[in-house]
A protein has these predicted regions:
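Glycine- and small/polar-enriched repetitive beta-structure motifs of secreted/surface proteins
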Residues: 1-397
Length: 397
C-alpha cells in the first residue's frame, strides 16, 4: 500500500511493502530496490540503493549506492552513500555527511557509528560502540566492541580487542580468539594467535604471534614473542625488551629483561634472568634466575644454572652442554667443553677442544681436539694451541 506512490515518469524500481519507496521521484530511472515495511520511505532522488527489511534505509533521501538488509539497517543516513549494512540494526545511526564507505555485517554491527568512515565491521555486536572512529577492521563476535572515536585498528576473532578505547588512533592489530581482548589504551601492538596478548591493558609496542604468546604481560611493552606460548608468563613491571622466537621459547620468563631467545624450548627455564642470549633448540635450557650468558647452538649450555651471573659464552653444537655451575668460560666449536660441569675460566676453541675436562679451570685449548683428554679436576693452567695440541695430556698441568 502506497508503495512507489510518488514516482511519475521513470522506472527500473522495485518496491514491495507498505510505503516502500513512497516518496521517490528521481527524475530518471533510479534502479532502487526496497522490500519491507517503509523500506526506503523517504528516498526522493537517491538511486542504486538496495533496501531489504522493515524500516531499512527509511531516512534516505538523496543517498546513492547503499545496501541495507535487515530491520532498521542504515536507518539514519539521508543524503550520502557507499555503505553496506547487513543485519538488524547495523549502521542504524550512521549519517556521515559524505559517502562513508562503511561495511557492517551482523546483528547491530556498527550500530552506534555516526560519522565514522571506511570501517569494515563483521559479526554480531562487532564495532558496536564506534561513533566517529575511522578505518577500523573488526571481524568476529564483539570484536573491537568498546572503541568509539578513533581508528586504524584491525581486530579479527571472537572478542579481539574487545576492550580497546585508546583515546587516539591506536594502530593495534589483533588476530585470533580473544587476542588482545583486554587492551584498553595500549597502542602499536601486533597480536596473532588464540589468546595472544590477552592480558595486555596499557602495554604498547609488543609483538606476540602464536597461541598464548605473551599472554600474561599487562601494562608494559617492547617485547617480541613468536611461537606457541613464547614469553607466556612474562609480566616484568617495566618495558622488557625481550625477544623470544620458537615453541615455548622463554615460556617461564616472568620478570627477566633484555633476553634474546631463538629456538624451540630455548631458555624455557628462565624466570628472572637478564641479558642472556640463547639461540638453538634447547640452548640455555636450565638457567632460571641469572644472566650474562651467550649460548648459540643446539643444546649449548643446556644444563647451566650457575646461581650467579655466568659470563659464559658457548657457540657450537653441544658446546658446554653439561655445564651446571661453571663461570667465565668461552667455548667455541661443536662439542667444545662438552664435559665441563663446574669448571671455570676456561677457553676452548675448535671441534672437541677441552672435551674431557669437567671441574677444572684456567685452561686454554685452541685447535681441533686440543687438550681433548685433559681432566685435571683443578686449575690446570694448560695452554695448547694447534691441531691436536696437548691431545694426549690427561692430568698434566
Amino acid at each position: 500500500y502506497f508503495a512507489l506512490s510518488t514516482e511519475d515518469a521513470h522506472g527500473n524500481n522495485t518496491a514491495i511493502g507498505y510505503e516502500a519507496l513512497k516518496t521517490q521521484d528521481a527524475g530518471a530511472d533510479a534502479n532502487n530496490v526496497a522490500v519491507g515495511h517503509q523500506a526506503g520511505l523517504l528516498v526522493s532522488t537517491g538511486t542504486l540503493n538496495t533496501l531489504v527489511g522493515a524500516f531499512a534505509g527509511d531516512a534516505l533521501t538523496t543517498g546513492t549506492n547503499n545496501v541495507a538488509i535487515g530491520t532498521y539497517a542504515l536507518g539514519a543516513e539521508d543524503g550520502d552513500g557507499g555503505n553496506v549494512a547487513v543485519g538488524a540494526g547495523s549502521l542504524m545511526l550512521l549519517n556521515a555527511g559524505g559517502d562513508a564507505y562503511n561495511v557492517a555485517v551482523g546483528f547491530e554491527a556498527g550500530k552506534a557509528l555516526s560519522t565514522g568512515v571506511q570501517n569494515v565491521v563483521m559479526g554480531a555486536f562487532a564495532g558496536d560502540a564506534l561513533t566517529t572512529g575511522n578505518q577500523n577492521v573488526a571481524i568476529g563476535y564483539q570484536a573491537l566492541g568498546s572503541e568509539d572515536g578513533n581508528g586504524k585498528n584491525i581486530a579479527i576473532g571472537h572478542y579481539a580487542l574487545n576492550a580497546q578505547n585508546a583515546g587516539a588512533d591506536a594502530y593495534n592489530t589483533a588476530v585470533g580468539w580473544e587476542a588482545g581482548k583486554l587492551i584498553n589504551t595500549g597502542v602499536n601492538n601486533v597480536l596473532a594467535g588464540g589468546l595472544a596478548g590477552d592480558a595486555l591493558t596499557t602495554g604498547s609496542y609488543n609483538v606476540a604471534i602464536g597461541h598464548e604468546a605473551l599472554s600474561t604481560e599487562d601494562a608494559h611493552g617492547r617485547n617480541v614473542a613468536i611461537g606457541h606460548r613464547a614469553l607466556k608468563d612474562l609480566n616484568v613491571g617495566a618495558d622488557g625488551y625481550n625477544v623470544a622466537v620458537g615453541f615455548d621459547a622463554g615460556t617461564n620468563l616472568t620478570t627477566g629483561t633484555n633476553n634474546v631467545i631463538l629456538g624451540a624450548v630455548a631458555g624455557d627455564a628462565l624466570t628472572t634472568g637478564t641479558d642472556n642470549i640463547a639461540i638453538g633448540i634447547g640452548a640455555l635450557g636450565a638457567e632460571d634466575g641469572h644472566g650474562l650468558n651467550i649460548a648459540i647452538g643446539t643444546n649449548a649450555l643446556t644444563t647451566l644454572d650457575a646461581g650467579a651471573q655466568g659470563h659464559n659464552v658457548a657457540i657450537g653444537y653441544n658446546a658446554g652442554t653439561a655445564m651446571t655451575t661453571g663461570l667465565n668460560n668461552t667455548l667455541i666449536g661443536s662439542y667444545t667443553g662438552d664435559a665441563l660441569t663446574t669448571g671455570t675460566n676456561n677457553v676452548a676453541m675448535g671441534y672437541g677442544a677441552l672435551g674431557s675436562e669437567d671441574t677444572g679451570g684456567q685452561n686454554v685449548a685452541i685447535g681441533v681436539n686440543a687438550l681433548n683428554t685433559a681432566n685435571y679436576d683443578g686449575n690446570g693452567l694448560n695452554v695448547a694451541v694447534g691441531y691436536g695440541a696437548g691431545a694426549a695430556v690427561t692430568t698434566g698441568v
